[in-house]
């Protein structure tokens, strides 16, 4: 569980660490990195500007690329138990007719499972052994390794020096400006959607999507229930979820009991979470004053179901590489991490952007053409670039060793032989 901890106590705990690490943002990427570093004996300071953890949560589908992070944390069994495999994926026409069903388990069986899990359950798994965090605190300036902590209202809180400062504060990151990343390359689709939860009526291993004319409906299994996403152009959502859900029902011939219950769940929720369908990426993750991680570095559209998984992978890669880092080699290890991981994340993000071009288009002719393509295009073909990433995960230990050896070869520190 997340444990509210005074900032002074976190700072005191890391006083003798070989690397003093600050993580700004207690989302999935920030928590994953903090917990992995703690498992390795460090005491990273973790802060979040929110006064309490109040994120309402949504559903996630995680590729097998995340599994090693849970193994390293000693919670892989808990992770498996908290989710449910999404074994099959079904695609429906804009009128609701089933067009095709593909096996996800056959697609990924060599590597693992495509696991459906709620965000809340995922955070419970990641923090199962306790996770100190200071809420109501963020950073508004960094200079020569010293971070200035402030309250959400801007009131000063403290200052402290660190060897590594990491911005993991989400897709609308403020740490981008603090660390000098500049404006991100962003895709603003003009679409949003509501997230709700529904009972699973009969098929807990099936994910379904209906790409309609001016709307999108998806249902995704998590443990004991379905995560529902119902979205459309922002202007069409102006009258609220119940009205939009009603308009969707009027445009579809065949929903069936499962999708009908999903639409009803959105309409009945008094305050469903609204998810804006935008993305963002920065050209560099390693910056003069720190590092960006997760959505702060590359925030995804949810069209390929890979964003959270890549955030976890990036955090795991960084944590494993920091095992072999000290202050003398830190800069080279960070550069090596970015060289290895950023192209993978950007390839996955580009795949999400490609699918978005299919999804976020209106008109019956467009819907018909899209369905013609999707009827012939298997999930294997649609997610081809992502499957390549699953099959070719880099070795962080080898990359870190190479970076460390290169540092010592270029400029051996006193008392160190470059050939040892």
What are these regions (language model features)?
Residues 1-19, 96, 304-305, 320-420:
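C-terminal helical "tail/cap" subdomain of flavin- and related membrane-associated enzymes
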Residues 2-21, 36-38, 63-179, 184-197, ...:
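Conserved N-terminal helical subregion
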Residues 23-39, 43-50, 166-167, 194, ...:
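Conserved mid-domain beta->alpha element of the FAD-binding
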Residues 52-68:
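Conserved N-terminal glycine-rich FAD pyrophosphate-binding loop of Rossmann-like flavoproteins
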Residues 147-148, 216-217, 226-227:
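Hydrophobic residues embedded in beta-strands of well-ordered beta-sheets
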Residues 189-220:
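Flavin-dependent oxidoreductases
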Residues 213, 223, 232-304, 310:
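FAD/FMN-dependent oxidoreductases across multiple families
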């Amino acid at each position: 569980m997340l444990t509210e901890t005074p900032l002074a106590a976190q700072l005191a705990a890391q006083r003798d660490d070989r690397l003093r690490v600050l993580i700004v943002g207690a989302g999935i990427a920030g928590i994953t990195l903090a917990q992995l570093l703690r498992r390795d004996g460090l005491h990273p300071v973790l802060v979040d500007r929110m006064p309490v953890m109040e994120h309402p949560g949504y559903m996630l589908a995680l590729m097998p690329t995340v599994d090693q992070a849970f193994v390293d944390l000693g919670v892989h069994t808990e992770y498996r138990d908290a989710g449910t495999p999404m074994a099959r994926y079904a695609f429906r026409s804009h009128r609701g007719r089933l067009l095709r069903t593909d096996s996800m388990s056959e697609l990924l069986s060599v590597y693992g499972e495509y696991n459906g899990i709620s965000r809340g359950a995922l955070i419970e798994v990641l923090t199962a052994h306790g996770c100190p965090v200071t809420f109501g605190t963020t950073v508004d300036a960094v200079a020569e390794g010293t971070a200035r902590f402030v309250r959400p209202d801007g009131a000063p809180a403290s200052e402290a020096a660190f060897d590594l400062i990491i911005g993991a504060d989400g897709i609308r990151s403020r740490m981008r400006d603090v660390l000098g990343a500049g404006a991100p390359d962003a895709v603003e689709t003009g679409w949003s959607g509501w997230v709700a939860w529904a009972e699973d009526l009969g098929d807990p291993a099936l994910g379904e999507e209906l790409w309609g004319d001016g709307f999108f409906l998806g249902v995704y299994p998590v443990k004991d229930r379905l995560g529902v996403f119902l979205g459309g152009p922002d202007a069409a959502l102006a009258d609220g979820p119940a009205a939009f859900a009603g308009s969707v029902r009027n445009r579809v011939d065949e929903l069936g009991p499962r999708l009908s219950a999903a639409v009803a769940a959105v309409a009945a929720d008094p305050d469903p979470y609204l998810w804006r369908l935008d993305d963002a990426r920065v050209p560099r993750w390693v910056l003069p004053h720190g590092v960006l991680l997760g959505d702060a570095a590359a925030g995804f559209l949810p069209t390929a179901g890979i964003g959270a998984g890549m955030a976890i992978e990036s955090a795991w890669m960084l944590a494993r590489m920091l095992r072999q880092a000290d202050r003398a080699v830190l800069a080279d290890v960070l550069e090596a991490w970015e060289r290895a991981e950023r192209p993978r994340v950007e390839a996955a993000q580009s795949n999400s952007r490609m699918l978005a071009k299919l999804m976020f288009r209106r008109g019956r002719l467009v819907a018909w053409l899209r369905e013609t393509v999707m009827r012939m295009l298997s999930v294997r073909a649609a997610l081809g670039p992502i499957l390549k990433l699953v099959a070719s995960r880099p070795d962080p230990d080898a990359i870190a060793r190479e970076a460390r050896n290169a540092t010592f070869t270029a400029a051996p520190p006193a008392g160190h032989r470059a050939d040892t």
